[in-house]
């Protein structure tokens, strides 16, 4: 077999491969002999059909099948011989495809980039330091109570925080507009659900009262037909209800799957969950900075085929997440291009880190992570057993741990500074990472 390789760009390779005619004929004859043993042709006993008849009927299909398989096999042999790592399926262009002659074709494809990780010392990481204080637990208890607020109907003027049952009709230039009317809508004053001035305009209203609100839609309103326009809303208040926060008792605790009657035990459980959330938030922010630093320090040219594959995966995920009747291929690729490039680039960099620093999953860390995941469930022992009994899930945990070990390896060499912050600041979502 003859092979020549040409680099047409940093990652694109062009292989010209020649397969001897003798090898082709051997494969064709092998298929014809297999066909002869099972062919059923009128006038001949099974297995006794003359080869000339078999060849006349089946040679063309046998040749096409043989050529297809030989192209696959010879391409694989060629990339192994040339020590190439294809990053996607090749584009095959036949040059000589005639009976009796050597098969010659050109395969064009991309290869994985070859690079070494550098610049770890230049990566700057700010590692947050925080604790869960008693005041943080107090705040969390209030948040949980507000999330489970009940409303009790009252006979008085409406105040901020009250829930109103209202009917309203909105008009622009004297005409009702789509989506501008509703009946029996529940609205909490001060929630910011409606455009500016709507909720404030109902403060002081009583059940049975009607008010007309003259308002203006924001210039950046999502409905461009209404953006910046003046509108009038005729509002009827059906009822006014005030918020009632639930008591911190056993009934309230049971809403969160905690079968405790004492406030101290509930606070301890909430505090434990907050500690877990804090650790995860700090770890996530450190990881994001490390990955951003690796990207900045190691610019890598990424095969287009890998990005296209990742775009397709993200399309499928989007359809599964948001549903609807849309097909993945109908979603514009541009929507996912930056995210796909970042994910693929980081995947290549992380894989190179694992290889370069000879990293392997630390089984003690795998066990710790599984136990931490399991601690969020009511039957943690069963969750741990499930992970260790499910090879696919266990493999995914090992991948997460390996990625954490990559982060730890970078932190050993990076410029790390610690910063003391409050619990709230530590768990506050970070800004979305920039694309590579």
From Swiss-Prot:
Coiled coil (residue ranges): none
Return the NCBIfam families for the record. tig
Q: What is known of its domains?
A: Consists of 3 domains; the N-terminus binds the ribosome, the middle domain has PPIase activity, while the C-terminus has intrinsic chaperone activity on its own.
User: Where does the PPIase FKBP-type domain lie?
Assistant: 161-246
Gene3D superfamilies registered for this protein in UniProt? 3.10.50.40, Trigger factor ribosome-binding domain, Trigger factor, C-terminal domain
Q: Which domain of life is it from?
A: Bacteria
Write the Enzyme Commission number(s) for this entry: 5.2.1.8
Identify the main location.
Answer: cytoplasm
Instruction: Give the reactions, separated by semicolons, that this protein catalyses.
Output: [protein]-peptidylproline (omega=180) = [protein]-peptidylproline (omega=0)
Q: Which top EC class is named for this enzyme in its record?
A: isomerase
UniProt record, GO biological process: 'de novo' cotranslational protein folding; cell division; chaperone-mediated protein folding; protein transport; protein unfolding
GO CC annotations, alphabetized: cytoplasm
The subcellular location is: Cytoplasm
Family note? Belongs to the FKBP-type PPIase family. Tig subfamily.
What protein name does the entry list? Trigger factor
What are the protein's UniProt keywords?
Cell cycle, Cell division, Chaperone, Cytoplasm, Isomerase, Rotamase
Family annotation (InterPro entries)? PPIase_dom_sf, PPIase_FKBP_dom, Trig_fac, Trigger_fac_C, Trigger_fac_C_sf, Trigger_fac_ribosome-bd_bac, Trigger_fac_ribosome-bd_sf, Trigger_fact/SurA_dom_sf
